Amino acid sequence: MPTTHFDLTLDICAEDGTRTRYYQQDEHIGGKTLRQLVSPRLFNQPLLTLASEHSVSAIPSRTIDVILAHTASPPPLTLPPQWLDVAEVNGESFLEAAGPDESPEARDQTASVVEIHTRGGWMVLLRVELAIQATFREERQFLAHFSDLPVIPFRLLAGGIGLINPPNIGRVTVTPPLKGVSETALQADLLSCSRP
């Protein structure tokens, strides 16, 4: 009889650019931890507290940019209304999905690649699939209320889940451009972004 091995690695990516790693190999405790992580109110508590038989760590929630929970057994995600799926991608996988001759706009009108940069310098590239937007106003709402979300959950490319703390987002770039937004925005192409 084959045995399955459970492990959970948590990377806490902070606004000061540090990454702190935690590990859990007990399946029962790890499952409980994952269920607590997918709470939409995760970042509303003042401290994120992690404990083991060896130590207790408390991290101010406001200083956390991203949490990455690497595991082969991720829990289902609670997504914001109108969001159908959110998954980490690499840049080439989305652009090559339908072949070189199709434009991103022709591939899937409900999916966008969203590049999120946080205050701590962390970057996540996500494929966000939304319910079909009926009006330009609804498209504008997607971007306008991005930072109002309590948490942005997503599936990790290598297995597991990720959670972004929206108040710590420094920039969001959406491809293809949302028509309802691009027609009213300042007209300029993104060339580069660098840290001092």
PLM features per residue range, with description:
Residues 1-20, 46, 53-55, 61-130, ...:
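Intrinsic disorder/low-complexity detector
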Residues 20-56, 132-141, 148, 153-161, ...:
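A cross-kingdom feature marking solvent-exposed beta-strand/loop segments within repeated
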Residues 44, 90, 165-168:
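Detector for Asparagine
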Residues 55-63, 160-168:
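Short coil-to-beta-strand transition motifs
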Residues 171:
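Active-site micro-motifs of SAM-dependent methyltransferase domains
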